[in-house]
Amino acid sequence: MLRRTKRTAAALAITFSAGLALAGVVQAQQKTMSIGTGGTGGVYYPLGGAVANVLSKSLPNVQATAEVTGGSVDNLKLIASGQSEMAFTMADAALDALQGQDKFKSGKVPLQALLVVYPNRMHVVTVEGSGIETMADLKGKRVSTGSPGGATEVMAFRVIEAAGLDKDKDMKRERLGVAESVNAIKDRKIDAFFWVGGIPTAAVTDLAATPGMKMKLIDHSETVEKMNAKYGKLYTASKIKAGAYPGTDKDNAIAEVWNLIVTGDKMSNDDAYAIVKTLVEKKADIVAVHKEAESFSLDNQIQERSPIPFHPGALKYFKEKGIGG
């Protein structure tokens, strides 16, 4: 009886060990994927949530999660540290990271583009009664140039410089995200703010729809030529169309820059291929969350819109679809 009990125990131990080994294999196959996005008042976060949802539903053994962050600069640092596998970023911030410039002087970040996604439009926002009609009128005013972890600050500084202003001497500068900037301008704590994002940005829509306030967008497309001369051909002159936000009755002449979804240098070709293929072919599911995803198109996958190289896995998919990449 004792011998049989020992045999049974041994058999159970073997079965249990085999079960643990099998569980380990299953666990190893499960991939978690952190996606750096932005603040809850912007466009990166809802789009990132939609991207995470599509990838989790469409790719076997993948669990993707959209992370709230400070924006492009924070996202690129998360990529550098290995805390995020993918991230949204503006092209200018990505180039700075790749080259170890500006906010990335502590070290270059190895980056590869997965997808060119949509253009970010610079908003220079104020309200009636602020005395601000042109960029020159920002002199002496209280102005938010974006949060420290976002790329709004990067581009805002360049727009201000190209407009002939000094960001440190010519204005009282705050460093607020878009939602915080909207609250501050409502409370009359600031006179204007910079925000670079998709159309519409929820927080800006909230300001435009606020009773008793008339939001104004300041033209600044004249800064594009000087910015490109100094920083490379990253920016284009564009417009925020009349009606894009409640109460806006004329086009706003602006500077814009393209957004990318990027990864570091660790993602396999197979994973990159599967991710890009899924995002392009499931675009309609993402558009249902935010219309800027309309730009997740093959026509936009050109090197001129991405200053960093495309991942080989992405290029494989583009080539299959007749796009050079």
Sequence positions of predicted segments:
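Sec/Tat signal peptide C-region and signal peptidase I cleavage site
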Residues: 20-28
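C-terminal lobe and pocket-closing loops
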Residues: 209, 214-274, 309-310, 317, ...
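Hinge/capping helix and adjacent helix->loop/strand transition within the periplasmic-binding protein
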Residues: 29, 33, 104-112, 118, ...
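Short, glycine-/small- and polar/acidic-enriched structural segments
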Residues: 29-147, 217
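Bacterial N-terminal signal peptides that target proteins for export
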Residues: 1-14
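Ligand-binding cleft/hinge of the Venus flytrap
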Residues: 51-61, 102, 153-171, 186-189, ...
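Short helix-initiation/N-cap motifs at beta->coil->alpha
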Residues: 66-77, 166-186, 199-202
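A ligand-binding cleft/hinge motif common to bilobed small-molecule-binding domains
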Residues: 80, 88-104, 157, 161-164, ...
